[in-house]
């Protein structure tokens, strides 16, 4: 999966609301472990360096949807200020006028941390009104909280319904490494699993069994498997209701040729306490009643090391024993050291979050692995192959199958001198754009002189209208032949203003489309519904009629040369804009319609632009949609904002 990241968007002067994971231990108002805060620093610093106004959201603990002083983020704000070397403003609220005022006063390069998101009951319920409020504070959402990626909450998933969401650097790294080991691991691939419950790891074992060469099982969960094999496990922790499942997993592994490696000895004791009597027993000899296995034994450590020795990819999730107590930590420590040694040899080594990450930190090995995940439950669900809502809500990098177009319709604006001056600026600023097409459509009076400036450049010349005859007694009209001679490559036909003001109908527009194609130019056929038609539920009917009649008489090859611009009439020049979801819905409908009229290959070749009050602050959410191939821009194409739109489009191209 390739997601958009914070690098792909222009942050200068933007309000960025960033979901981070500051769920850290706090005692007596002091942060005890700042690992998670440090993990978010690269993303925060980058946003500040780019001139963003940064608003941070995080939860801490489980305050049950209401303010609770012991879960306040005030101590986190203090620690973050120390780590950043600059003031972090803190608002002891998550919604309301106090929050709005603090955001309004925020300057470029400043940071604001809101109070614990879980002080509001709507956070964990993914309340759309709460998400909408947070979204209203910002231009873009950055999700850098992998630890909550398996939760659909308002601060990580809900906001993305209202403003574009991109990944921070930590989220990007998590996705990169976990995707590698889940979907495309280098062989030999060894999975090391531990922890208490088989039930917690069923999904991981089942999914990774399709790819792993060996699965090494330690921790308390090993005793459920050992009992399934008929071994005596004494008072060791066993999930009795999962014994049959353990048998099934062992059988399934055998069928798939995956080696399941279980411990051959264990460190046992009668109590889980420091300093108690302990001893090592072989599994085949059985663990006496009243004794429980609390760590893997020395023979198992050597066995696991040997099974790991040739690995090119290793995933480790779950400790080998009760590592929190030094008497039972050796197995976990030795396995950690063995995996760390493989990292030095070039293997990809990934440590799941939760207890595994805590163990790595205890042994001072946190920088000895390719990646140590910051999410326990999230990393487990990712390894199970599940789609995590906190990742699904991040905008995908656009997979380009059609060359995108950014077209500017200047309408009845700019004199010849103004047009020449502005197009010269565009040429200077956008001269290196090759990834997509840029088209400018000045008034007819400026076409020739603008065309001379654009000659041989990467920016294409377009016209705003045309008549369908080459010549004749048509006072005031411009013919396709005239446009062709000037060097025009694109021609807008059927714009809603011409349909409405000049009463152009579909038959008339169809004749224009054919005339433009005949002269080797590309028509941009505009379609779209009025507000009244939308409110009556007629959007698809109106658009279907306009598309069918606009394409009437065109064969497949001619159809492929037409560009469609969906412009909801109610959004043109009104400041209103279709939501990304509304726009995508109509674009998808048009593409499906084209496949019915022609075939899927033809429909997949035709570019469909969106037009309707496009501006830099709404363009990203539109352009990342699957079926939107660019924009036909009105007012924003007359100013330097057109350059910003081009930068936004550049950022989304994979």
Swiss-Prot record:
Q: Where does ATP bind?
A: 201, 293, 317, 324, 353-356
Gene3D superfamilies in alphabetical order:
Aldolase class I (3.20.20.70), Phosphoglycerate kinase, N-terminal domain (3.40.50.1260)
SUPFAM superfamilies according to UniProt: Phosphoglycerate kinase (SSF53748), Triosephosphate isomerase (TIM) (SSF51351)
The main location is cytoplasm
- Output the CDD domains linked to this UniProt entry: Phosphoglycerate_kinase (cd00318), TIM (cd00311)
Quote the PROSITE patterns the UniProt record gives.
Answer: PGLYCERATE_KINASE, TIM_1, TIM_2
UniProt-annotated location(s) = Cytoplasm
Q: What is its EC number?
A: 2.7.2.3, 5.3.1.1
Pfam families (alphabetical): PGK, TIM
Catalytic activity line of the entry? (2R)-3-phosphoglycerate + ATP = (2R)-3-phospho-glyceroyl phosphate + ADP; D-glyceraldehyde 3-phosphate = dihydroxyacetone phosphate
The entry's active site is: 495, 567
* Start and end residues of each stretch annotated as Phosphoglycerate kinase: 1-399
The Swiss-Prot or TrEMBL record describes its family as follows: In the N-terminal section; belongs to the phosphoglycerate kinase family.
Q: How does it assemble?
A: Monomer (PGK) and homotetramer (PGK-TIM).
Record protein name field? Bifunctional PGK/TIM
């Amino acid at each position: 999966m390739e997601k958009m990241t914070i690098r792909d968007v222009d942050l200068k002067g933007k309000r960025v609301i960033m979901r981070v994971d500051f769920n850290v231990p706090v005692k007596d108002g002091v942060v005890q472990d700042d690992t998670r805060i440090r993990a978010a620093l690269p993303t925060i610093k980058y946003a500040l360096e780019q001139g963003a106004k940064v608003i941070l959201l995080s939860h801490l603990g489980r305050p049950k949807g209401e303010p609770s002083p012991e879960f306040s983020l005030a101590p986190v704000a203090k620690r973050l200020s120390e780590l950043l070397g600059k003031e972090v403003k803190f608002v002891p609220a998550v919604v309301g006028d106090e929050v709005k005022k603090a955001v309004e006063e925020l300057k470029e390069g400043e940071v604001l941390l809101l109070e614990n998101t879980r002080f509001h009951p709507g956070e964990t319920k993914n309340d759309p009104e709460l998400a909408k409020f947070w979204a209203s504070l910002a231009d873009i959402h950055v999700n850098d909280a992998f630890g909550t990626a398996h939760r659909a909450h308002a601060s990580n998933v809900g906001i993305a319904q209202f403003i574009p969401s991109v990944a921070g650097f930590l989220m990007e790294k998590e996705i990169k490494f976990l995707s590698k080991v889940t979907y495309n691991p280098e062989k030999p691939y060894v999975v090391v699993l531990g922890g208490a419950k088989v039930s917690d790891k069923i999904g991981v074992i089942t999914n990774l069994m399709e790819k792993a060469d060996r699965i090494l099982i330690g921790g308390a969960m090993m005793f459920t498997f050992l009992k399934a094999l008929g071994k005596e496990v004494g008072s060791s922790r066993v999930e009795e209701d999962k014994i049959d499942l353990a048998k099934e997993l062992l059988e399934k592994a055998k069928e798939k040729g995956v080696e399941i490696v279980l411990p051959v000895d264990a460190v046992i004791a009668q109590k889980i306490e420091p300093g108690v009597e302990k001893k090592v027993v072989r599994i085949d000899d059985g663990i006496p009643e009243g004794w429980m296995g609390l760590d893997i034994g020395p023979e198992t450590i050597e066995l696991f090391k040997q099974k790991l020795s040739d690995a090119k990819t290793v995933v480790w999730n779950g400790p080998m024993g009760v590592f929190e107590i030094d008497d039972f930590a050796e197995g976990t420590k030795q396995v950690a050291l063995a995996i760390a040694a493989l990292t030095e040899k070039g293997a990809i080594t990934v440590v799941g979050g939760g207890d595994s990450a805590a163990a790595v930190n205890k042994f001072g090995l946190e920088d000895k692995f390719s990646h140590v995940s910051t999410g326990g439950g999230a990393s487990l669900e990712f390894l199970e192959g599940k789609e995590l809502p906190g990742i699904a809500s991040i905008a995908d990098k656009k997979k380009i199958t059609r060359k995108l177009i950014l077209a500017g319709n200047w309408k009845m604006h700019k004199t010849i001198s103004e047009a020449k001056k502005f197009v010269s600026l565009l040429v200077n600023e956008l001269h290196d754009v090759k990834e997509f097409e840029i088209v400018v459509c000045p008034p007819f009076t400026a076409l020739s002189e603008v065309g001379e400036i654009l000659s041989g450049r990467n920016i294409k010349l377009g016209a705003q209208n045309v008549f369908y005859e080459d010549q004749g007694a048509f006072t005031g009209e411009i013919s396709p032949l005239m446009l062709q001679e000037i060097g025009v490559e694109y021609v807008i036909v059927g714009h809603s203003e011409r349909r409405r003001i000049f009463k152009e109908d579909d038959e008339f527009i169809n004749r224009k489309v054919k005339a433009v194609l005949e002269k080797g130019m590309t028509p941009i056929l505009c379609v779209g519904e009025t507000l009244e038609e939308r409110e009556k539920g007629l959007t698809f009917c109106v658009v279907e009629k306009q598309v069918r009649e606009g394409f009437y008489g065109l064969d497949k090859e001619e159809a492929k040369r037409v560009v469609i611009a969906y412009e909801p009439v109610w959004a043109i020049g009104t400041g209103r804009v279709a939501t990304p979801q509304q726009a995508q819905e109509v674009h998808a409908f048009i593409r499906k319609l084209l496949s019915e009229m022609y075939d899927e290959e033809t429909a997949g070749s035709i570019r469909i632009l969106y037009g309707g009050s496009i501006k830099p602050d709404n363009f990203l959410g539109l352009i990342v949609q699957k079926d939107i191939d660019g924009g036909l821009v009105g007012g924003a194409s007359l100013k330097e904002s057109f350059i910003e739109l081009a930068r936004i489009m550049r950022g989304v191209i994979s």
